[in-house]
Amino acid sequence: MESNAHIVEYWKTQPEVLEACLKNSLPLTENFVKLYQEVRPTHLYLVGSGTSLNAEETAVSFMKEMLDIDVISMPSSYVHDIRGDRPMFVFLSQGGSSTNTLKAMEETAAYPFITVTGEETCEIASRSSCHMVIGCGEEPVGPKTVGYTASV
């Protein structure tokens, strides 16, 4: 288990990670914007587990307001009730290897989707033709705090 001092030092990196995300928001979101414009979804589904799901829940209201469409967050272990003529999925996994998220990707493969992870090279990115990196890098501690900040 990590020492508390190590975790606290890691948590202190959040402001610089957030600042980098904001500075690089255009290149970081380019693939999402491109897919969104191609699909013009009627519903946007944010799918993840754990900290990723918590970050998605936080982002739902903002995304609804900005995109003016239905935005639904759901756990990757229970993808259900897909609605709309043109649904689109966002699969978020800071660590990039969530088995539930990989399973959800397989179950919804008929729909357009983008994967979002903390690093470019990971299992989830390798199974996606449209990928976005959130810029938090690898999380060396259990709680995905920096990943949460970058995801939101």
PLM features: residue spans?
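Glycine-rich phosphate-binding loops that contact phosphosugars or nucleotide phosphates
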Residues: 37-152
